[in-house]
Design a protein with these regions (language model features):
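Basic, glycine/lysine-rich polyanion-binding surfaces/domains
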Residues: 1-191
Length: 191
């Protein structure tokens, strides 16, 4: 990855969850420890069926009083529905922000140019008020910025990033053993 390259991940979607007991709600559902997620750390997690079969995978990021979930766009409706089923009477709000926010990825080298950036998978900081995090699955995959669509192009210009071919990003991802697309085929099949 070139230090100036940015990849607009238009196949990703964003959910926002917040509410009184959001931490306990997520702790009882996801495959990772929600206590690891804070303003300076994000994590990779899955949602499993009651039988322990894989349903959804995502990255979870602390944001304001709740959590952002960065997931595959083809899975967002199903994940939203599944989380809503588990919500029951909890005072939890689940919002699909996919039409307002976008996920962009750029290299580790560029991430390390930010003040206070650390070379640790999942390390999270803010660019203005938007979260930037080093991919928790493999830091070599670089960082992701979740940003409001209206601010995207101005922010990319200020960060001196230029749009690059998304195929390069996914080719690199595959070389690292991370398959970020078409996980619907695996639902309810893997333990």
């Amino acid at each position: 990855m070139n230090i100036k390259d940015v990849y607009i991940l238009d196949d990703r979607a964003i959910l926002y969850l917040n509410g009184e007991n959001i931490k306990n709600f997520l702790q009882n559902l996801i495959s990772n420890d929600i206590n690891k997620v804070n303003d300076s750390n994000s994590c990779f997690a899955s949602l499993l069926s009651p039988q322990g079969k894989f349903l959804y995978e995502f990255i979870i990021i602390k944001h304001k009083s709740g959590y952002l979930i960065d997931c595959e766009k083809s899975q967002v409706d199903g994940l939203f529905k599944q989380l809503s089923v588990y919500k029951l009477r909890s005072k939890i709000e689940i919002l699909n922000l996919s039409n307002e926010f976008v996920v962009v990825a750029f290299g580790l080298e560029k991430f390390l140019t930010f003040d206070q950036a650390k070379d640790i998978p999942g390390f999270t900081l803010k660019y203005r008020e938007d979260p930037i995090f080093l991919d928790p699955r493999n830091k070599k995959l670089g960082a992701r910025l979740i940003i409001n669509l209206e601010k995207l192009y101005l922010s990319l210009k200020k960060l001196e990033l230029q749009n690059a071919d998304i195929k390069e990003y996914y080719l690199f991802s595959h070389k690292l053993g991370i398959v970020p697309k078409d996980l619907n085929k695996l639902q309810n099949k893997l333990f």
